[in-house]
Regions:
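Radical SAM/AdoMet-radical enzyme domain recognition
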Residues: 54-73, 81-184
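Short loop/turn motifs at secondary-structure junctions and domain boundaries
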Residues: 62-63, 258-262, 278
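Flexible mid-to-C-terminal extensions adjoining Fe-S/redox cofactors in radical SAM and related proteins
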Residues: 1-13, 35, 271-330
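Residue-level signal for mature regions of secreted extracellular proteins and peptides
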Residues: 18, 22-25, 71, 255, ...
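Radical SAM enzyme [4Fe-4S]-AdoMet core and its adjacent flexible, acidic
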Residues: 124, 128-267, 272-273
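Short catalytic/ligand-binding loop motif for oxyanion handling, primarily in non-cytosolic enzymes
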Residues: 38-41, 80-82, 112-113, 163-165, ...
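Glycine-rich short-loop/terminal segments
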Residues: 24, 33, 57-59, 68, ...
Length: 330
């Protein structure tokens, strides 16, 4: 990958809401911190207040001229969250369609019947595969059902160092059994916490695997897609502009944006305890708490990034530029 000049909107300015809806998960992966699954903040109470606060947030941005939104839900495991359906329905009521997007990061542990009933609520689905817990047959069954129905359907295989070959084999199974697929072979970050470093694989063959196997994809049958403008493009050194590939940015070590202008006011990260913060990196201020019904409409402008590296793929999508190209995103 070439060096990056800037990351820019696909079309018009848009707002990203990245929401870790709770900290409860039915999986207990050894590489995952207890803070992601223990259930200290399940957020299953006072759902109407949560929905009303989301509405307040969206109306604020709409008053500022924003029409397109992307809601990206993770956990924990968000498909088990009691507020999931009412939250997504309220979001869809206020976002502009076509053009906006609801995405979800799930472990595919819900049955096929659930996905048949609710898949219409989501444009993008990232299905993480966890070698210690995922049920391979069930995962494949759901993936095959969704393969021609989503704008974006990605199998994100978490490359556990002790189950590395199992992960490789499962990726091969998807490629053999599915007509359409996108597979990301994802290096595991130690404890999956923002402050930690990437996991360093001890065996050379595992390190070598990532050099040639970042992302693979195929489309053999038509996909029902609606236009989406809530995404980003990468502007490269040679002036080519391509859709952003967040996994490649990580695996090729391009996630270093210190000193760049970053429009963190166009991104909200909602933590499991309800805290609303501009971006997920910790640089932006806290602007409310969604489970307490609080939102401060006085948001900061873009910042010159002080961090050595950007740890969260969702933050890669925020408009950002090297100083000499900052005017392109103001």
């Amino acid at each position: 990958m070439q060096d990056i000049k800037a990351i820019i909107p696909a079309k018009d300015k848009w707002v990203s809401i990245v929401w870790q809806v709770n900290d409860w998960c039915n999986f207990r992966c050894t590489y995952c911190s207890e803070w992601n699954w223990a259930g200290r903040n399940r957020n299953d109470h006072d759902i109407p207040l949560i929905v009303d606060t989301l509405e307040k947030i969206m109306l604020h941005y709409k008053d500022k001229g924003y029409e397109y939104f992307k809601l990206y839900l993770s956990g924990g495991e968000p498909t088990f969250w009691k507020a999931l359906i009412p939250v997504v329905e309220k979001f869809r009521e206020h976002a502009k369609w076509p053009g906006s997007c609801v995405g979800i990061n799930t472990n595919f542990s819900k049955p096929l019947s659930w996905w048949k009933e609710n898949h219409h609520l989501f444009e993008d689905i990232v299905a993480s595969y966890h070698a210690e817990w995922s049920k391979d047959d069930k995962y494949i069954e759901v993936y095959k059902f969704l393969q021609d129905k989503k704008n974006y359907l990605c199998s994100r295989i978490m490359m556990h160092h002790d189950h590395f070959q199992q992960c490789v084999d499962f990726g091969n199974r998807i490629r053999e059994e599915c007509d359409n697929y996108m597979i990301e072979y994802a290096p595991v970050y130690d404890e999956l916490r923002p402050s930690t470093d990437p996991y360093h694989y001890n065996e050379q063959w595992q390190m070598d695997f990532f050099k040639t196997n970042s992302t693979v994809q195929q489309q053999s049958i038509p996909v029902q897609k609606d236009p989406s403008y809530a995404w980003a493009k990468t502007w490269f050194e040679d002036d080519t502009i391509e859709p952003i590939n967040t996994n490649s940015i990580i695996t090729e070590g391009k996630n270093f944006f210190q000193g760049w202008l970053c429009n963190i006011h166009e991104s909200l990260h909602i933590h499991p305890n309800g805290r609303i913060q501009q971006a997920s990196c910790g640089v932006g201020p806290i602007v409310g708490n969604i489970v307490q019904g609080e939102f401060n409409t006085t948001l900061s402008d873009g910042v010159w990034c002080p961090k050595s590296h950007c740890h969260c793929a969702a933050d890669f999508n925020i408009s950002k530029a090297r100083p000499e190209y900052a005017e392109k995103i103001r």
